[in-house]
């Protein structure tokens, strides 16, 4: 499952497989590449609010949903700075209001059906365009909802993290609070009452010996008090410092409470604000855009359906009327409805965007509040640490507490001294008693032995009398250092404390010590509790050290007798109670009913009778006779009734007595049950108390471990900060080293300049060396030519090995450029990594492109504004130039006027001078001349003023002209700068356009090389996977370039860059006017520049996930196969192997025939030539078989040439003979060192089982690779005897280099028995012998199995000549013929085996005892 990565402040949602990150820093780097969150500002949390660690990157969630990781930027929690740094708050600009175009509503001819169809077509196009715009708005709205959801989830996780951190510190604060409040009260009491405690200690007398013992002999006063146990100076100093320490401790506790209160209040406010945010969340309206889009789609489908229906109309009047009616329906109902839904979609988009920006701002505020609460938590934690580390204050109050607890301490020492004294006395008394008792037992035993020896033992001699074993009791250790104290001193000490008005708590503690001194010990309590329900529980009683001679049986019999007597006593008491009850009942029943009833009736009768006698004597006689009969009857009736009542009363009494007995028995049973239930309840209560105590201790331990875990996490965080600081120092050091390197580089350049003078001297030497080098190069060329042939051969061999890697390497080269290709095993992982990097680069490039597009738009707007400003500036400049020209003309006119005035003034002055001269000469009258002079002077003054004003006006105009010139120059400079900036941005836009195009082209080529085809239709990019058959069918013979076998994309990869017709769009900026440029840019973005990065990412992601799924599947299968292999290996460890022999296997070794003496081979199927190295411990001469465990296997090849050379040179080497068994040349065989697994096994298989010689094993070669009917056709085949003979008769060199010697060659045909003795393979199948004549061959059904006729191999049980039809499941030795061996062996070439179908009554004289021995051997380890 991919992991969802959620960015808190932007609302982004990314997907990544965290298994590719080996460290958390890699994940940080990936986040930094794909998001604006830098690694140094990186914070990651899980949905539960826990910090993401390296181990949690690989931890998969238990639920099937995807795992999520929340990423935060720590700059979110920082207050906004005033230095102009960019804000972290992600604000999306509100979209422009969507202007709904009017629907087409004009028709040329209402009577022509074609006009109506054209109107329907235009309305359909209008509706489709509106649907596309609404779809885009729906996608944008859903994206905004998704961003809000991500932001709220991240805030929720941050709040959960804050709650977790506060919950971690809360137990510490609670525990500290429980301790602080009583501590403050105690400190206040100690700081005010310490003098009272000191006075109590000063006035309380104690035992001098005990004081001397407690102070280690430092205090030895005769009249000792409790004050002697402390130092008065230290006590006074502690009492002086106590108020200050108490005030300081109280201040710390108050600060702790204040910090905790502020933290909890802020946390409650934060949670309340978050609940408000959740309650007013707009996520509940996330489905509105989809519903609106569905409504719009329904309307558009209706319009499209009407359009298609209108296409089928003919030109009839009815169809025209129907078309008009449908168009009216569109105009009145569908078109307004569509506009209304589009307007609602636009309003929803505006609302969602505003809500998203609000949530983003609220999220940042929440993060800042969380940071503030976290700082308060850190302050609270520091306060807790400060309060816990108040050692000086605690030391002061500890000493004062010691002064307070002096009576208790002294009493505890007294109690301990009394207990130790009692223990010593008990040990001495019990040891003496035990010694005396054991001496009596020893004496009794000695007397008994003497009596027995005298009566019986002396019969066989006097030597049977021995000493009686005795017991010596000795007491170890000496505990006499404690002073002698009795209980009276302790009671007197308690009375002295009561007399001085000591605190009740101290008196209770001392009284409790005295009570504990009188309470029984644990063993005594156990013995007291042993008596339950009138019986003794031995488990609770324990064992006594002074039992009578330690006779458990005697003690048990006595206890049984006691229980029997107690049961008899209970029975007797029950009977006595029953008899007493019966006696009481009988006495109550035998009493008369009423002894004092009145006799009035009888007297009255007698009176009546008397009167009657007197009255009538005759009647009396008659009445008396009748009354007598009546009375007799009445008496008999009453007697019968009395007898019945007595019987009924006796029955009732018996019933009552029985019921009373049953009631008593039931009461006794209920009493016993209640007592048993009471005991059980007490036991359960005790267990409950133990469990509660254990649970409390475990909870305390859990709290302690959680606190330690939190401290450890804090230390890890501090360690990370120290790592950051260390890395910063390393970076500074690297900068210093770079500066040093630059300095060294500069010095090196200086040295190079200095060394330039030496170059000329070295050139001559270089020339000489060049000549030598040429010589060496020629020699090297010769060597290269010589090795060229070898390299060609190596290249030919390597081409076959590199063919299957070429496609991956080409893909790697396309992805990575010039990077080196990794190893074969890492190539797929590298390609995955590169694909992920390309995806990240594409996303970064798209984000950069979007930014650059925004910059480009802004730049265009600025350029446009600057151009407008430049035009306005030019207009102003032209106006100013015209004004300046006008001013210049005015100035020139004024100058001309000034010159004229000056000329006129000069003339006037000349006239004045002449007038003055004339006046002087007396030519005219003085008055007239004076008037003229005054006039001329006034005229001159006015002209001078006018001249001055005109000159000042000319100066101001010149200054204004100079100012306009400066403005013109500044505007020209700004215009040139903007033009240059615009050209620079144009170049950058060209570069970005080309890079975007090339990146899109490369990504399309990457998709094509990965087996996908890219196509575009109606502005939508589609990526489809090319089937493997189509990829293979395009170019099946070309395996060098995997890209050529893939279908080319229809988007960018169909043509080369210089051949594509769409390349004109790539140069969209080379346009004559702005409209053409805008049109080309839009066409470029729709055709070449638009690339669906999300679809590309999903495709690459799914492809990688498919690869990972296959890898996990294969890994799981490999793990299951490995487990099965381990199980099979474990099962096979104690079973006899018959193939794939290796060290540690059990093997069955059998002697061979027609070989040198001592040739024993391993029983095998398809793995011949495994011979046993004989050892003295094997004792092979006395065995018929050997089961041994392989210690070592040596592989050897028979080389007869070495033997011939050794014979020719007549030299004998000390080396071991490589052909001790006389095998054929070139044959590969194996020498096995084995150790018998069960030394001491019987030398013979069993009684009556062996009927052949020790070295003769009877078997038959009955292997067929073909049917019996095809024997004549395959005589020259490789698998026939002739083929084997030809193969074995090859040259020595070819036989050594062939691989046919590595496995056994099966042979076929019934005549193989005769051929085995007349060809070379007879020496290599010496373990097989011709079958008996009566054994039928090739008549049994074919069975699948593996069988070998290896040289020196064991006989094959599937073809044993003397064996008949085998019993099923005879033992492990028969695994050579069934499928069980194939389950644990590697797949080999299977041969068809035909078993012999001899007589079912015939038994194998060799294998039956072997299987029985094998079964006995493996029976202990059978699984």
Swiss-Prot record:
GO cellular component, alphabetical, reads: Atg1/ULK1 kinase complex; phagophore assembly site membrane; vacuolar membrane
State the Pfam families in the record.
ATG11 (PF10377), ATG17_like (PF04108), Cleaved_Adhesin (PF07675)
GO biological process per UniProt: autophagosome assembly; autophagy of mitochondrion; piecemeal microautophagy of the nucleus; protein transport; reticulophagy; ribophagy
Ranges of biased composition (kind: Basic and acidic residues) = 631-648, 1383-1395
Note the superkingdom of the native organism: Eukaryota
Where does this one sit in the cell?
Preautophagosomal structure membrane; Vacuole membrane
Which Cys-Cys disulphide bridges does the record give? none
Phenotype on disruption: Impairs the cytoplasm to vacuole transport (Cvt) pathway, pexophagy, mitophagy and non-selective autophagy. Enhances conidiation and significantly reduces cephalosporin production.
Stated membrane topology is: Peripheral membrane protein
Composition bias (Polar residues) maps to 585-602, 650-660, 1034-1047
Q: Which positions are tagged coiled coil?
A: 551-589, 625-978, 1102-1130
Q: Which GO terms describe its molecular function?
A: molecular adaptor activity; protein kinase binding
Q: Disordered: where is this region?
A: 583-660, 1028-1048, 1327-1423
Task: Could you list this entry's UniProt keywords, alphabetically sorted.
Answer: Autophagy, Coiled coil, Membrane, Protein transport, Transport, Vacuole
Main localization of the protein described in the UniProt heading: membrane
- Output the InterPro entries linked to this UniProt entry: ATG11, Atg11_C, ATG17-like_dom, Cleaved_adhesin
PANTHER family linked to this entry: RB1-INDUCIBLE COILED-COIL (PTHR13222), RB1-INDUCIBLE COILED-COIL PROTEIN 1 (PTHR13222:SF1)
Listed under subunit, the entry gives: Homodimer and potential homooligomers. Interacts with ATG1 kinase and the ATG19 and ATG34 cargo protein transporters. Interacts with ATG9, ATG17 and ATG20.
UniProt family annotation: Belongs to the ATG11 family.
**Functional description taken from the UniProt entry:** Involved in cytoplasm to vacuole transport (Cvt), pexophagy, mitophagy and nucleophagy. Recruits mitochondria for their selective degradation via autophagy (mitophagy) during starvation, through its interaction with ATG32. Works as scaffold proteins that recruit ATG proteins to the pre-autophagosome (PAS), the site of vesicle/autophagosome formation. Required for ATG9 anterograde transport from the mitochondria to the PAS. Also recruits the ATG19-prAPE1 complex to the PAS. Required for the Cvt vesicles completion. Plays a role in morphological differentiation and cephalosporin production.
What is the protein named? Autophagy-related protein 11
């Amino acid at each position: 499952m991919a992991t969802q990565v959620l960015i808190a402040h932007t609302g982004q949602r990314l997907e990544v497989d965290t298994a590719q990150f080996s460290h958390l820093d890699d994940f940080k780097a990936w986040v930094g590449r794909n998001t604006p969150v830098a690694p140094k500002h990186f914070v990651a949390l899980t949905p539960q609010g826990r910090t993401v660690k390296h181990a949690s990157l690989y931890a998969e969630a238990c639920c099937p949903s995807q795992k999520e990781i929340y990423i935060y930027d720590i700059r979110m929690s920082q207050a906004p700075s005033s230095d102009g740094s960019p804000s972290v708050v992600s604000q999306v600009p509100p979209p422009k209001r969507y202007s709904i175009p009017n629907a087409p509503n004009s028709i040329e001819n209402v009577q022509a059906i074609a006009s109506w169809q054209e109107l329907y077509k235009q309305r359909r196009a209008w509706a489709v365009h509106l649907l596309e715009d609404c779809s885009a708005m729906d996608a944008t709205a859903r994206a905004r909802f998704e961003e809000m959801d991500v932001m709220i989830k991240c805030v929720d996780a941050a709040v959960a993290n804050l709650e977790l951190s506060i919950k971690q510190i809360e137990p510490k604060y609670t525990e500290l609070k429980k301790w602080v409040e009583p501590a403050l009260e105690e400190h206040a009491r100690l700081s005010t009452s310490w003098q009272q405690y000191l006075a109590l200690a000063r006035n309380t007398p104690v035992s001098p010996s005990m004081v001397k013992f407690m102070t280690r002999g430092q205090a030895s006063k005769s009249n000792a008090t409790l004050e002697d146990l402390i130092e008065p100076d230290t006590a006074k100093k502690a009492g002086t410092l106590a108020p200050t320490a108490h005030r300081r401790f109280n201040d710390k506790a108050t600060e702790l409470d204040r910090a905790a209160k502020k933290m909890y209040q802020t946390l409650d406010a934060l949670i309340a604000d978050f609940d408000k945010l959740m309650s007013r969340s707009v996520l509940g309206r996330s489905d509105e855009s989809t519903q609106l889009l569905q409504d719009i789609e329904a309307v558009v489908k209706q319009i499209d359906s009407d359009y298609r229906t209108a296409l089928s109309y003919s030109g009839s009047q009815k169809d025209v009327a129907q078309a008009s009616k449908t168009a009216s329906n569109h105009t009145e109902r569908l078109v307004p409805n569509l506009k209304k839904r589009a307007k609602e979609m636009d309003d929803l988009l505006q609302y969602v965007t505003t809500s998203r920006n609000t949530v983003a701002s609220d999220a940042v505020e929440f993060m800042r509040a969380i940071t503030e609460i976290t700082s308060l938590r850190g302050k609270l934690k520091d306060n807790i640490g400060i309060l816990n580390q108040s050692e000086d204050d605690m030391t002061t109050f500890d000493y004062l507490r010691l002064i307070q607890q002096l009576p208790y301490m002294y009493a505890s020492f007294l109690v301990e001294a009394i207990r130790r004294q009692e223990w010593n006395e008990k040990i001495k008394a019990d040891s003496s008693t035990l010694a005396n008792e054991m001496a009596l037992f020893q004496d009794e035993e000695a007397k008994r032995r003497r009596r027995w020896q005298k009566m019986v033992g002396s019969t066989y001699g006097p030597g049977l009398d021995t000493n009686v074993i005795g017991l010596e009791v000795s007491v170890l250790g000496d505990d006499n250092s404690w002073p002698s104290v009795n209980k009276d001193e302790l009671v007197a000490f308690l009375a002295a404390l009561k007399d001085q008005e000591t605190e009740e708590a101290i008196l209770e503690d001392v009284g409790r010590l005295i009570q504990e001194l009188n309470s029984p010990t644990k063993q005594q309590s156990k013995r007291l509790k042993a008596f339950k329900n009138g019986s003794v529980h031995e488990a609770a009683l324990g064992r006594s050290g002074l039992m009578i001679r330690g006779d458990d049986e005697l003690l048990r019999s006595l206890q049984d007798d006691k229980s029997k007597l107690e049961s008899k006593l209970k029975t007797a008491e029950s009977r006595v109670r029953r008899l007493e009850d019966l006696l009481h009942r009988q006495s109550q029943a035998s009493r008369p009913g009423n002894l004092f009833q009145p006799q009035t009736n009888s007297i009255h009768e007698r009176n009546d009778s008397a009167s009657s006698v007197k009255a009538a004597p005759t009647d009396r006689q008659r009445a008396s006779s009748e009354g007598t009969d009546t009375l007799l009857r009445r008496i008999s009736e009453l007697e019968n009734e009395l007898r019945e009542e007595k019987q009924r009363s006796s029955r009732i009494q018996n019933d009552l007595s029985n019921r009373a007995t049953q009631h008593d028995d039931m009461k006794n049973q209920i009493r016993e049950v209640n007592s048993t239930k009471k005991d059980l309840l007490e036991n359960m209560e005790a267990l409950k108390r133990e469990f509660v105590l254990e649970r409390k201790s475990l909870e305390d331990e859990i709290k302690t471990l959680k606190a330690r875990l939190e401290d450890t996490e804090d230390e890890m965080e501090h360690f990370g900060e120290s790592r950051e600081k260390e890395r910063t120092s390393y970076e500074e050091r690297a900068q210093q080293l770079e500066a040093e390197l630059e300095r060294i580089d500069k010095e090196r350049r200086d040295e190079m300049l200095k060394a330039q003078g030496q170059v000329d001297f070295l050139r001559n030497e270089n020339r000489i060396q060049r000549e030598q080098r040429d010589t060496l190069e020629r020699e090297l060329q010769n060597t290269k030519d010589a090795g060229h042939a070898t390299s060609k051969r190596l290249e030919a061999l390597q081409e076959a090995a590199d063919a299957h890697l070429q496609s991956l390497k080409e893909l790697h080269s396309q992805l990575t450029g010039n990077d080196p290709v990794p190893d074969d095993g890492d190539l797929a992982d590298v390609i995955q990594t590169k694909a992920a990097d390309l995806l990240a680069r594409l996303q970064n490039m798209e984000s950069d492109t979007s930014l650059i597009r925004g910059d480009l738009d802004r730049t265009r707007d600025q350029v446009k504004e600057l151009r407008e400003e430049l035009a306005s500036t030019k207009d102003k400049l032209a106006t100013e130039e015209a004004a300046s020209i006008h001013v210049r003309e005015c100035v020139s006119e004024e100058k001309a006027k000034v010159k004229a005035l000056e000329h006129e003034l000069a003339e006037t002055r000349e006239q004045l001078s002449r007038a003055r001269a004339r006046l002087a000469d007396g030519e005219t009258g003085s008055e007239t001349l004076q008037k003229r002079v005054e006039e001329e002077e006034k005229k001159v003054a006015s002209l001078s003023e006018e001249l001055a004003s005109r000159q000042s006006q000319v100066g101001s105009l010149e200054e204004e002209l100079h100012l306009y010139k400066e403005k013109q120059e500044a505007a020209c400079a700004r215009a040139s700068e903007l033009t240059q900036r615009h050209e620079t941005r144009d170049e950058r836009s060209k570069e970005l356009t080309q890079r975007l195009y090339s990146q899109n082209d490369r990504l399309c080529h990457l998709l094509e090389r990965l087996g996908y085809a890219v196509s575009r239709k109606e502005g939508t990019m589609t990526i489809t996977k090319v089937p493997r058959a189509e990829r293979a069918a395009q170019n099946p013979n070309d395996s060098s370039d995997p890209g050529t076998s893939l279908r080319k994309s229809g988007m960018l990869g169909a043509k080369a860059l210089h051949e594509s017709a769409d390349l004109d769009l790539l140069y969209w900026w080379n346009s004559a006017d702005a409209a053409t440029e805008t049109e080309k840019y839009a066409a470029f973005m729709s055709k070449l520049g638009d690339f669906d990065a999300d679809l590309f990412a999903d495709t690459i992601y799914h492809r990688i996930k498919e690869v990972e799924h296959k890898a996990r599947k294969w890994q799981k299968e490999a793990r299951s196969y490995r487990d099965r292999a381990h199980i099979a290996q474990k099962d096979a460890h104690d079973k006899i192997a018959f193939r794939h022999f290796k060290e540690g296997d059990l093997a069955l070794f059998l002697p061979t025939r027609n070989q040198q003496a001592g040739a024993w081979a391993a029983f095998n199927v398809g793995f011949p030539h495994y011979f046993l190295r004989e050892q003295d411990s094997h004792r092979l001469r006395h065995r018929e078989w050997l089961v041994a465990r392989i210690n070592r296997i040596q592989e050897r090849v028979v080389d007869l040439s070495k033997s011939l050379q050794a014979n020719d040179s007549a030299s004998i080497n000390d080396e071991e003979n490589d052909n001790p068994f006389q095998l054929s040349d070139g044959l590969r065989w194996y020498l096995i060192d084995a150790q018998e697994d069960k030394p001491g096994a019987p030398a013979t298989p069993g009684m009556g089982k062996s009927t052949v010689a020790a070295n003769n094993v009877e078997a038959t070669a009955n292997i067929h690779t073909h049917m019996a009917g095809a024997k004549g056709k395959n005589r020259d085949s490789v698998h026939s005897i002739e083929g084997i003979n030809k193969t074995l008769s090859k040259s020595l060199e070819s036989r050594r280099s062939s691989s046919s010697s590595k496995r056994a060659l099966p042979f076929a045909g019934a005549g193989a028995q005769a051929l085995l003795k007349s060809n070379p393979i007879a020496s290599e199948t010496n373990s097989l012998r011709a079958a008996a004549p009566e054994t039928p061959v090739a008549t049994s059904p074919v069975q699948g199995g593996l069988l070998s006729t290896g040289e020196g191999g064991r006989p094959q049980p599937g073809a044993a000549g003397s064996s008949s039809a085998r019993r099923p499941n005879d033992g492990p030795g028969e695994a050579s013929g069934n499928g069980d061996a194939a389950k644990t062996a590697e797949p080999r070439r299977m041969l068809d085996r035909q078993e012999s179908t001899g007589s079912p009554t015939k038994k194998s004289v060799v294998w039956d005892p072997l299987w029985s021995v094998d079964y006995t051997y493996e029976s202990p380890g059978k699984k």
